[in-house]
UniProtKB/Swiss-Prot annotation:
It catalyses: O-phospho-L-seryl-[protein] + H2O = L-seryl-[protein] + phosphate; O-phospho-L-threonyl-[protein] + H2O = L-threonyl-[protein] + phosphate. Mn(2+) 2 binds at residues 147, 309, 348. It comes from Oryza sativa subsp. japonica. The lineage of its organism: Eukaryota, Viridiplantae, Streptophyta, Embryophyta, Tracheophyta. Coiled coil: none annotated. SMART domains: PP2C_SIG, PP2Cc. GO terms for biological process: pollen germination; signal transduction. PANTHER family: PROTEIN PHOSPHATASE. This is Probable protein phosphatase 2C member 13, mitochondrial. The keyword Heme does not apply.
Length: 363
């Protein structure tokens, strides 16, 4: 997602496009040669002083799904379980970098399964979170896939904080869309502040689904995707945030940024997505403002698939939801989709959450 090799080549174009005077950016202390966070520095001098952007190439730590590390990373069981929700299973692949699990509500109306695989990558930068809770007697379910780039920290931060922040929002039950939008952007700000002294520039996507009563809210930042099956047809509830999307390109250019071809279309010739958490060096062009879709949970809504682009790069929307409708256990669906993506040559981490809606049925 991040092309560091092209960053140095593209930066002069970005600088010329954004200002006619000496460019000055707000940079973390680690990148500004000891200048306090919030101080402006000459970006050209910074580039010379740090031998280009080699300093941003921070080796991501290996994150294997052993029983301890998977649990610590939120990669096993939901952290909160509402009354009436029962765990079905949880498996981890140890050194294989594989984890999966699932649960079902006792009334049989909602089932969830998830699978996460390091795949062909040496490091794991995908995270996911599943939470079930109750607020003022209202059952709430939250599902999220976070695909990191430039390191795992941003995705891990979202797993640890995004839903916790959302559940604390005062308007969560009364204006859920507003709560989601504000929480996404606040969490992004909090992450950037927490990393202000860190010598890295991690970023992450977020594809989330929040079920409150009979309403499903799907929010997206980046190129992870959410797809539902509605009345037998696959329907994407999110649109990938790519720099060559006409509306996204216009937004970036209006903010003073540029979209450059460097193997694919990239913001400033660097990032192959137009919205993300983190990526402080590309703010304000790369934002964490989500696009949100609301769906009524009725008999037409059959299933939901959330996944990172490691799946969607090689699996079509229709194929994913078709499998989700034919299998009884959503964990089995998630595992099969992960295996299909890997067998088709997906070179990325692969993470998938499958939610099945069963209307007027009991187990």
């Amino acid at each position: 997602m991040v092309c560091f090799a092209s960053l140095r080549r593209a930066l002069p174009l970005l600088l010329r496009a954004t200002t006619t005077t000496t460019p000055r950016f707000l940079l973390p202390r680690a990148l500004s040669g000891g200048v306090g966070g919030g101080a402006a520095v000459d970006a050209r001098a910074l580039l010379r002083g740090h031998s280009g952007w080699r300093g941003l190439r921070v080796a991501a730590r290996m994150m294997l799904d052993s029983s301890d590390s998977a649990a610590a990373a939120g990669q096993m069981q939901p952290q909160q379980r509402a009354a009436g929700a029962v765990a079905c299973s949880a498996q981890d692949g140890g050194a294989a970098g594989y984890a999966s699990g699932g649960w079902a509500r006792e009334d049989g109306k909602l089932k969830c399964g998830y699978s996460s695989f390091r795949g062909k990558r040496a490091t794991m930068e995908d995270f996911y979170d599943v939470k079930l809770t109750e607020i003022d007697g209202q059952a709430v379910s939250l599902f999220g896939v976070f695909d990191g780039h430039g390191g795992p920290r941003a995705a891990e931060y979202l797993k640890e904080n995004l839903f916790e922040n959302l559940l604390k929002h005062p308007e969560f039950l009364t204006d859920t869309k507003l709560a989601i939008s504000e929480t996404y952007q606040k969490t992004d700000t909090d992450f950037l502040e927490s990393e202000s002294n860190a010598f890295r520039d991690d970023g992450s996507t977020a594809s989330t689904a929040v079920l409150v009563g009979g309403h499903l809210y799907v929010a997206n930042v980046g190129d992870s995707r959410a797809v539902v099956s509605k009345a037998g047809k696959a329907m994407a509830l999110s649109e990938d945030h790519k720099p060559n999307r006409s509306d996204e390109r216009k937004r970036i250019e209006n903010a003073g940024g540029v979209v450059i071809w460097a193997g694919t279309w990239r913001v400033g010739g660097v990032l192959a997505m137009s919205r993300a958490f983190g990526n402080r060096l590309l703010k304000p062009f790369v934002v964490a403002e989500p696009e949100i879709q609301e769906e009524l949970v009725n008999e037409d809504l059959e299933c939901l698939v959330l996944a990172s682009d490691g799946l969607w790069d090689v699996v079509e929307n229709e194929e994913a939801v078709s499998l989700a409708k034919t299998e009884d256990l959503p964990e089995s669906v998630a595992r099969k989709l992960t295996e299909i993506a890997y067998s088709r040559g997906s070179a990325d981490n692969i993470t998938c959450i499958v939610v099945q809606f069963h209307h007027d049925k009991t187990e």
